[in-house]
Amino acid sequence: MSWLQVKVLTDEAGAAALEQIFEGLGALSVTMLDAADDPVLEPDLGTTPLWRNTQVVALFSADTSAEMVREQLERNQIAAADIECEVIEDRDWEREWMTHFHPMRFGSRLWICPSWGEPEDPNGVNLLLDPGLAFGTGTHPTTALCLTWLDSQQLQGKQVIDFGCGSGVLAIAALLLGADHATGTDIDPQALEASRDNAERNSVSEGLTLHFPEQMPEMQAEVVIANILANPLISLAPKLATLTLPGGSIALSGILKDQEEAVAEAYRNYFELDPTEYKEDWVLISGRRLPY
Protein backbone atom coordinates (compact mmCIF):
# COMPACT_ATOMS: atom_id res chain seq x y z
CA MET A 1 0.00 0.00 0.00
CA SER A 2 1.28 3.50 -0.81
CA TRP A 3 0.58 6.98 0.54
CA LEU A 4 0.92 10.59 -0.56
CA GLN A 5 3.14 12.48 1.86
CA VAL A 6 3.17 16.28 1.72
CA LYS A 7 5.73 18.34 3.66
CA VAL A 8 5.64 22.10 4.12
CA LEU A 9 8.34 24.19 5.80
CA THR A 10 6.86 27.04 7.81
CA ASP A 11 7.29 28.91 11.08
CA GLU A 12 5.48 28.42 14.35
CA ALA A 13 2.85 31.02 13.45
CA GLY A 14 1.87 29.20 10.25
CA ALA A 15 1.89 25.65 11.60
CA ALA A 16 -1.58 25.68 13.17
CA ALA A 17 -3.16 27.17 10.03
CA LEU A 18 -1.47 24.51 7.90
CA GLU A 19 -2.83 21.79 10.14
CA GLN A 20 -6.36 23.05 9.52
CA ILE A 21 -5.78 23.28 5.77
CA PHE A 22 -4.46 19.71 5.59
CA GLU A 23 -7.34 18.37 7.66
CA GLY A 24 -9.78 20.17 5.37
CA LEU A 25 -8.16 18.45 2.38
CA GLY A 26 -8.72 15.03 3.96
CA ALA A 27 -5.32 14.27 5.47
CA LEU A 28 -5.19 10.99 7.38
CA SER A 29 -2.61 12.41 9.78
CA VAL A 30 -0.77 15.68 10.37
CA THR A 31 2.56 15.78 12.22
CA MET A 32 4.68 18.76 13.26
CA LEU A 33 8.44 18.32 13.42
CA ASP A 34 11.43 20.47 14.11
CA ALA A 35 12.94 21.19 10.69
CA ALA A 36 16.14 19.63 12.10
CA ASP A 37 14.10 16.48 12.91
CA ASP A 38 14.68 16.79 16.64
CA PRO A 39 12.23 15.03 18.99
CA VAL A 40 9.81 16.84 21.27
CA LEU A 41 10.89 17.71 24.81
CA GLU A 42 8.41 17.75 27.66
CA PRO A 43 6.12 20.78 26.99
CA ASP A 44 4.40 23.03 29.48
CA LEU A 45 1.00 21.66 30.48
CA GLY A 46 -1.63 22.47 27.85
CA THR A 47 0.85 23.60 25.19
CA THR A 48 2.03 22.22 21.86
CA PRO A 49 5.77 22.75 21.31
CA LEU A 50 6.61 24.45 18.00
CA TRP A 51 9.98 25.47 16.63
CA ARG A 52 11.26 28.56 14.82
CA ASN A 53 11.42 26.39 11.68
CA THR A 54 8.63 23.85 11.72
CA GLN A 55 7.99 21.13 9.16
CA VAL A 56 4.33 20.15 8.87
CA VAL A 57 3.91 16.66 7.39
CA ALA A 58 0.55 15.41 6.12
CA LEU A 59 -0.26 11.87 5.01
CA PHE A 60 -3.00 11.26 2.43
CA SER A 61 -4.39 8.15 0.75
CA ALA A 62 -2.59 7.28 -2.49
CA ASP A 63 -5.52 8.34 -4.70
CA THR A 64 -5.25 11.95 -3.50
CA SER A 65 -4.08 14.31 -6.24
CA ALA A 66 -0.74 15.90 -5.39
CA GLU A 67 -1.50 18.71 -7.83
CA MET A 68 -4.78 19.44 -6.06
CA VAL A 69 -3.01 19.65 -2.71
CA ARG A 70 -0.30 21.91 -4.16
CA GLU A 71 -2.89 24.18 -5.76
CA GLN A 72 -4.83 24.57 -2.50
CA LEU A 73 -1.66 25.30 -0.54
CA GLU A 74 -0.54 27.93 -3.04
CA ARG A 75 -4.00 29.54 -2.86
CA ASN A 76 -3.33 29.88 0.87
CA GLN A 77 -0.12 31.80 0.22
CA ILE A 78 2.24 28.84 0.68
CA ALA A 79 5.29 29.26 -1.55
CA ALA A 80 5.74 26.46 -4.08
CA ALA A 81 9.39 26.11 -3.04
CA ASP A 82 8.28 25.20 0.50
CA ILE A 83 6.01 22.33 -0.63
CA GLU A 84 7.34 18.79 -1.09
CA CYS A 85 5.10 15.95 -2.33
CA GLU A 86 6.21 12.32 -2.37
CA VAL A 87 4.55 8.95 -2.83
CA ILE A 88 5.87 6.58 -0.16
CA GLU A 89 5.47 2.84 0.04
CA ASP A 90 4.20 1.13 3.16
CA ARG A 91 7.12 -0.22 5.20
CA ASP A 92 7.94 -2.28 8.21
CA TRP A 93 8.55 0.85 10.26
CA GLU A 94 10.10 -1.04 13.17
CA ARG A 95 12.73 -2.54 10.88
CA GLU A 96 13.19 0.84 9.21
CA TRP A 97 13.94 2.34 12.63
CA MET A 98 16.36 -0.48 13.39
CA THR A 99 18.46 0.33 10.32
CA HIS A 100 18.98 3.90 11.53
CA PHE A 101 19.64 3.33 15.23
CA HIS A 102 23.31 2.68 15.90
CA PRO A 103 25.37 2.63 19.12
CA MET A 104 26.13 6.10 20.51
CA ARG A 105 28.85 6.94 23.00
CA PHE A 106 28.56 9.55 25.76
CA GLY A 107 31.64 10.46 27.76
CA SER A 108 34.26 7.79 28.37
CA ARG A 109 32.15 4.80 29.47
CA LEU A 110 28.48 5.11 28.56
CA TRP A 111 26.88 3.73 25.38
CA ILE A 112 23.26 3.70 24.16
CA CYS A 113 22.91 0.52 22.09
CA PRO A 114 20.17 -1.23 20.10
CA SER A 115 19.26 -4.40 21.96
CA TRP A 116 19.41 -6.57 18.82
CA GLY A 117 23.09 -5.90 18.06
CA GLU A 118 26.46 -6.56 19.64
CA PRO A 119 27.72 -3.76 21.92
CA GLU A 120 30.36 -1.58 20.30
CA ASP A 121 32.42 -1.80 23.52
CA PRO A 122 31.72 -4.99 25.51
CA ASN A 123 33.63 -3.48 28.46
CA GLY A 124 31.66 -0.24 28.38
CA VAL A 125 28.47 0.65 30.24
CA ASN A 126 25.84 -0.37 27.69
CA LEU A 127 22.23 0.83 27.95
CA LEU A 128 19.97 -1.22 25.66
CA LEU A 129 16.92 0.18 23.89
CA ASP A 130 14.29 -1.20 21.52
CA PRO A 131 11.96 0.42 18.95
CA GLY A 132 8.78 1.69 20.54
CA LEU A 133 10.51 2.25 23.90
CA ALA A 134 13.13 4.71 22.80
CA PHE A 135 11.87 8.29 22.84
CA GLY A 136 14.77 10.12 24.46
CA THR A 137 17.44 7.86 22.99
CA GLY A 138 20.29 10.36 23.12
CA THR A 139 19.86 11.79 19.63
CA HIS A 140 18.65 15.15 20.97
CA PRO A 141 21.42 17.50 22.18
CA THR A 142 19.85 17.93 25.63
CA THR A 143 19.72 14.17 26.24
CA ALA A 144 23.30 13.87 25.00
CA LEU A 145 24.41 16.65 27.37
CA CYS A 146 22.74 14.93 30.32
CA LEU A 147 24.15 11.50 29.51
CA THR A 148 27.66 12.90 29.12
CA TRP A 149 27.30 14.73 32.44
CA LEU A 150 26.15 11.54 34.19
CA ASP A 151 29.15 9.67 32.77
CA SER A 152 31.44 12.28 34.35
CA GLN A 153 29.97 11.85 37.85
CA GLN A 154 30.99 9.49 40.64
CA LEU A 155 27.63 7.79 41.19
CA GLN A 156 28.61 4.69 43.15
CA GLY A 157 26.24 4.17 46.07
CA LYS A 158 24.33 7.40 45.49
CA GLN A 159 20.62 8.21 45.24
CA VAL A 160 19.53 9.87 41.98
CA ILE A 161 16.31 11.72 41.11
CA ASP A 162 15.33 12.04 37.42
CA PHE A 163 12.67 14.78 37.44
CA GLY A 164 10.63 14.56 34.22
CA CYS A 165 12.06 11.16 33.38
CA GLY A 166 10.42 10.54 29.98
CA SER A 167 11.64 7.14 28.82
CA GLY A 168 13.80 6.75 31.94
CA VAL A 169 17.05 6.76 29.98
CA LEU A 170 18.80 9.12 32.40
CA ALA A 171 17.71 7.24 35.53
CA ILE A 172 18.67 3.91 33.96
CA ALA A 173 22.03 5.28 32.84
CA ALA A 174 22.69 6.45 36.41
CA LEU A 175 21.94 2.96 37.76
CA LEU A 176 24.18 1.30 35.19
CA LEU A 177 26.93 3.78 36.10
CA GLY A 178 26.78 2.67 39.74
CA ALA A 179 24.01 4.60 41.48
CA ASP A 180 22.43 2.71 44.35
CA HIS A 181 18.87 3.80 43.57
CA ALA A 182 17.07 6.10 41.12
CA THR A 183 13.68 7.76 41.45
CA GLY A 184 11.91 8.89 38.29
CA THR A 185 8.90 11.17 38.08
CA ASP A 186 6.77 12.26 35.12
CA ILE A 187 3.27 13.63 34.48
CA ASP A 188 2.74 11.20 31.57
CA PRO A 189 1.65 7.63 32.41
CA GLN A 190 3.05 6.42 29.07
CA ALA A 191 6.44 7.82 30.05
CA LEU A 192 6.36 5.91 33.32
CA GLU A 193 5.42 2.73 31.47
CA ALA A 194 8.26 3.23 28.98
CA SER A 195 10.66 3.83 31.89
CA ARG A 196 9.49 0.62 33.54
CA ASP A 197 9.97 -1.40 30.33
CA ASN A 198 13.39 0.08 29.62
CA ALA A 199 14.53 -0.62 33.20
CA GLU A 200 13.43 -4.23 32.88
CA ARG A 201 15.29 -4.61 29.59
CA ASN A 202 18.45 -3.36 31.29
CA SER A 203 17.97 -5.50 34.44
CA VAL A 204 17.80 -2.52 36.80
CA SER A 205 14.10 -2.63 37.73
CA GLU A 206 14.85 -3.27 41.41
CA GLY A 207 16.82 -0.05 41.62
CA LEU A 208 14.20 2.21 40.00
CA THR A 209 11.13 3.72 41.66
CA LEU A 210 8.61 5.67 39.55
CA HIS A 211 6.02 8.24 40.65
CA PHE A 212 3.69 10.89 39.34
CA PRO A 213 4.98 14.22 40.73
CA GLU A 214 2.11 14.64 43.18
CA GLN A 215 2.75 11.14 44.57
CA MET A 216 6.47 11.59 45.08
CA PRO A 217 7.43 11.12 48.74
CA GLU A 218 9.44 13.67 50.68
CA MET A 219 13.04 12.79 49.96
CA GLN A 220 16.48 14.09 49.06
CA ALA A 221 19.18 12.72 46.79
CA GLU A 222 22.87 13.29 46.16
CA VAL A 223 22.17 13.75 42.43
CA VAL A 224 19.17 15.45 40.79
CA ILE A 225 18.77 15.73 37.01
CA ALA A 226 15.97 17.45 35.09
CA ASN A 227 15.83 17.55 31.29
CA ILE A 228 12.57 19.41 30.70
CA LEU A 229 12.14 23.05 29.52
CA ALA A 230 13.33 26.44 30.73
CA ASN A 231 10.05 27.81 32.11
CA PRO A 232 9.22 24.72 34.21
CA LEU A 233 12.83 24.64 35.44
CA ILE A 234 12.57 28.25 36.62
CA SER A 235 9.32 27.65 38.49
CA LEU A 236 10.65 24.38 39.94
CA ALA A 237 13.88 25.87 41.32
CA PRO A 238 12.79 25.80 45.00
CA LYS A 239 11.42 22.26 44.61
CA LEU A 240 14.52 20.87 42.90
CA ALA A 241 16.76 22.61 45.42
CA THR A 242 14.81 20.98 48.26
CA LEU A 243 15.24 17.57 46.60
CA THR A 244 19.05 18.00 46.47
CA LEU A 245 21.09 17.15 49.55
CA PRO A 246 23.54 19.85 50.73
CA GLY A 247 26.73 19.31 48.75
CA GLY A 248 24.82 17.25 46.19
CA SER A 249 24.87 17.81 42.43
CA ILE A 250 22.20 19.01 40.01
CA ALA A 251 22.07 19.04 36.20
CA LEU A 252 19.46 20.98 34.22
CA SER A 253 18.81 20.88 30.48
CA GLY A 254 16.10 21.44 27.90
CA ILE A 255 17.42 25.03 27.89
CA LEU A 256 18.17 27.11 24.79
CA LYS A 257 21.21 29.40 24.78
CA ASP A 258 19.10 32.55 25.05
CA GLN A 259 17.35 31.09 28.13
CA GLU A 260 20.58 30.24 29.98
CA GLU A 261 20.83 33.36 32.14
CA ALA A 262 17.19 33.27 33.27
CA VAL A 263 17.50 29.64 34.40
CA ALA A 264 20.90 30.19 36.02
CA GLU A 265 19.55 33.20 37.94
CA ALA A 266 16.73 31.07 39.38
CA TYR A 267 19.25 28.58 40.82
CA ARG A 268 22.11 30.82 42.04
CA ASN A 269 20.60 31.23 45.49
CA TYR A 270 20.62 27.46 45.97
CA PHE A 271 23.66 26.17 44.04
CA GLU A 272 27.27 27.00 43.26
CA LEU A 273 27.06 26.75 39.48
CA ASP A 274 29.64 25.17 37.19
CA PRO A 275 30.68 26.51 33.78
CA THR A 276 27.81 25.92 31.35
CA GLU A 277 28.05 23.07 28.84
CA TYR A 278 26.89 23.71 25.26
CA LYS A 279 25.77 21.49 22.38
CA GLU A 280 24.37 23.12 19.25
CA ASP A 281 21.66 25.57 20.41
CA TRP A 282 21.22 23.90 23.80
CA VAL A 283 22.87 24.18 27.21
CA LEU A 284 23.32 22.17 30.39
CA ILE A 285 23.56 24.01 33.71
CA SER A 286 25.03 22.10 36.65
CA GLY A 287 26.16 22.86 40.17
CA ARG A 288 26.47 21.82 43.79
CA ARG A 289 23.88 22.48 46.49
CA LEU A 290 24.90 25.17 48.93
CA PRO A 291 24.81 24.19 52.64
CA TYR A 292 22.09 26.72 53.54
Swiss-Prot record:
Q: Is the keyword Signal in the record?
A: no
**An individual GO BP term:** methylation
Q: What is its main location?
A: cytoplasm
Query: Its gene?
Result: prmA
Q: What keywords are assigned to this protein?
A: Cytoplasm, Methyltransferase, S-adenosyl-L-methionine, Transferase
Q: What is its EC number?
A: 2.1.1.-
Residue ranges the record marks as coiled coil: none
Xref: PANTHER family: ELECTRON TRANSFER FLAVOPROTEIN BETA SUBUNIT LYSINE METHYLTRANSFERASE (PTHR43648:SF1)
Q: Name one GO cellular component term.
A: cytosol
Taxonomy of the source species:
Bacteria, Pseudomonadati, Pseudomonadota, Gammaproteobacteria, Oceanospirillales
- Which reaction(s) does its UniProt entry say it catalyses? L-lysyl-[protein] + 3 S-adenosyl-L-methionine = N(6),N(6),N(6)-trimethyl-L-lysyl-[protein] + 3 S-adenosyl-L-homocysteine + 3 H(+)
State the organism named in the record: Hahella chejuensis (strain KCTC 2396)
Major enzyme class: transferase
Binding sites annotated in the UniProt record for S-adenosyl-L-methionine: 143, 164, 186, 227
Q: Where in the cell is it found?
A: Cytoplasm
Q: Which GO terms describe its molecular function?
A: protein-lysine N-methyltransferase activity
Family membership: Belongs to the methyltransferase superfamily. PrmA family.
Q: What name has this protein been given in UniProt?
A: Ribosomal protein L11 methyltransferase
What this protein is reported to do is described as: Methylates ribosomal protein L11.
